[in-house]
Amino acid sequence: MKDKTYIAIDLKSFYASVECRERGLDPLDTNLVVADESRTDKTICLAVTPSLKSYGISGRGRLFEVKQRVKEANAGRQLNAPGHRLDGTSHFFSELQANPSLAIDFIIAPPRMAYYMEYSTRIYQVYLKYIAPEDIVVYSIDEVFLDVTDYLNTYQLSAHDLAMKIILDVLETTGITATAGIGTNLFLCKVAMDIVAKHIPADKNGVRIAELDEMKFRRELWTHQPLTDFWRVGRGIAKKLEQNGMFTMGDVALCSERNEDLLYKLFGKNAELLIDHAWGWEPTTIAAIKAYRPSSNSLSSGQVLHCPYEPQKAKLVVREMTDLLVLDLVDKGLVTDQMVLTIGYDIENLTDQARRARYHGAVEKDPYGREIPKQAHGSINFDGHTSSTRKIMWAVSELFDRIVDKNLLVRRMYVVANHVLPEADAPKKNGGAVQLDLFTDYAAEEEKQKAEDAALERERKIQAATLAIKKKYGKNAILKAMNLEEGATAKDRNAQIGGHKA
């Protein structure tokens, strides 16, 4: 079988680069951060330009951290400035390098998610000039995988030259530069891009391209740390590995030879993927990804609140989310037979002494290592598949009341419609034989069922009309009374994409 060649392309600081280009600025020479300052300085930064990152600023930190780091960097510049005095500011990296008397400044650009999606679509059209859609997997808004195995002979180019040709076309078309990784499988091209390319100098256009095969991976990355730099190795997996004496991928590979059972004991079936990656193997192809069909499907909605909510106010938000999720089901022609609700509590429940004294339940740690009350989680089943707003809203409200601690502040919530199917594929009710008895009024039952069917049909017409109006006039063209109550978030979220300004 012919050896495969894959290219992974990551658009450099994508959101920040778009904002620079729209201002006529060079993304490689401009200090800019994409963040919604109206949400306070605790808001997460969606992107940071490379020049601003050079001051030790994380690409996904919070705005107050950016301001603090710039303040610290300016303190250092002042010490080294002539007369220990800074005179003027600049957000251009080249000016700051040339003039030590200038203070570091930066632009805060509010996010425009719809605009970034438009840019991403334009860039995807560039990829299509070179590669067929069946050989492209869109990994995220700013990252793709390309199977270029059958294109190298066609273009009479090496993988490196083809990657460069595509990236320079993107640069010419949009002004956005990129980093690329080339590998003999999807894992290796991703790791080449994420790890190796970061440690090689960029060319004059800011482009970095790195290559890996299995043997080069073992030679160069078996000793690399930290483990979390590797694709699909999160903090939880890395912590377990380190607790068992494995600090590098080389350690994992060695363990797989000497004590494979330990890895399966720690990670179950997921150990197979970890072992493969430790050796630089990845059998999954783009063709396999394209052909994959999950055995079970779901639709979900999640939200992190800007501040802690009392349970009753949080219930309002859950009802709003459920209402919109049901409309999404109807719009897609889907039905569900199970709703799942997860409620995450706020750190204030344990940092506030009075609240902590009242709480005696289980405690867990959030992603930042802080103690919080254990999240609430539950599910509720229907006797058949449905997309009825009335039925689903009642079920989720009942589930909320059942699982949520009424004394705790809520910070995050997730609503999931499970086992979704196309309505035409859903099992029909009353399809089998019915056991008759002498004590049931079947005429009354039949009338009751007719009334229920009529109510569902009326509801379906209302749902269809609501969707039609929202599509024509915008998501906020029709609002319910609950959307106008104090603490409601749907109206604002309707103007967002992915929780950020559209």
Language-model features, listed with the residues they occupy:
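DNA-contacting surface of Y-family translesion DNA polymerases
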Residues: 8, 103, 229, 239-410, ...
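Short, charged/polar surface micro-motifs in flexible loops or helix N-caps
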Residues: 12-14, 38-42, 345-350, 420-424
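Acidic, metal-coordinating catalytic segment for phosphate/diphosphate chemistry
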Residues: 18, 369-502
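Short, well-ordered secondary-structure micro-motifs
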Residues: 191-192, 351-354, 425-428
